[in-house]
Amino acid sequence: MSGRNVESHMERNEKVVVNNSGHADVKKQQQQVEHTEFTHTEVKAPLIHPAPPIISTGAAGLAEEIVGQGFTASAARISGGTAEVHLQPSAAMTEEARRDQERYRQEQESIAKQQEREMEKKTEAYRKTAEAEAEKIRKELEKQHARDVEFRKDLIESTIDRQKREVDLEAKMAKRELDREGQLAKEALERSRLATNVEVNFDSAAGHTVSGGTTISSSDKMEIKRN
């Protein structure tokens, strides 16, 4: 008793290759292997040998249990040839890749423009703040200059006022000195003494009369010095 069984197996492998332009080329390798098996079976009369049951594990034991005693099996496998097939990406895939690249470029440009706009806003805000601060500083400097001028003016006026008061005070002191000198002069005149020699000859019918006297005038001498 004999028979033939034919089995076909298909193996497929896919390979992805990235070329220099950045596109992905998909290459599919298709391998078809045809296996042919031939089985020859010989039937023999079974021999009965009572034996204790044996439980075997593994592929050999399982095959022996399936076939049974008295049967032998032989098989031969023949491998066929292989063929390699290269597949190019379709037009749809190429268009999709082009759209992806264009979208990527647009997103990059959008990011760059957004960052540029943000920098412009920040620069403008910083410029306005700096100008406002500079204006405040300028006004404060003007106020400080006005305060300096007013302070110098006050110093000059204060100095002039002090000198004027000193002159007035000196004039008052000089007048008082003159007043005191005049008072001293008056007192000196009051303290002066007079001494006079007088001789009077008086002739009359009654006779001849002679009278005399001495007057001495003296005064105290005082020196007044002014610094």
From Swiss-Prot:
Residues 1-35, 86-126, 206-227 are annotated as: Disordered. It comes from Hypsibius exemplaris. Residues 163-181 are annotated as: CAHS motif 2. CAHS proteins contain 2 repeats of 19-mer peptides designated as CAHS-motifs that comprise each two octapeptides connected by a tripeptide. The gene is CAHS 94205. CAHS proteins are cytosolic heat soluble proteins that seem to contribute to the anhydrobiosis in tardigrades, but their specific mechanisms are yet to be identified. It is possible that protection during anhydrobiosis might occur via the stabilization of vitrifying small molecules such as sugars, but not via the direct glass transition of CAHS proteins themselves. Trehalose, a disaccharide essential for several organisms to survive drying, is detected at low levels or not at all in some tardigrade species, indicating that tardigrades possess potentially novel mechanisms for surviving desiccation involving tardigrade-specific intrinsically disordered proteins (TDPs). Belongs to the Cytosolic-abundant heat soluble protein (CAHS) family. Residues 126-144 are annotated as: CAHS motif 1. This is Cytosolic-abundant heat soluble protein 94205. Keywords: Coiled coil, Cytoplasm, Repeat, Stress response. One of its GO terms (cellular component) is cytoplasm. It is found in: Cytoplasm. GO terms for biological process: response to desiccation. The keyword Coiled coil applies. Residues 1-15, 24-35, 95-126 have a biased composition (Basic and acidic residues). Residues 91-191 form a coiled coil. Induction: Expression is highly induced during desiccation.
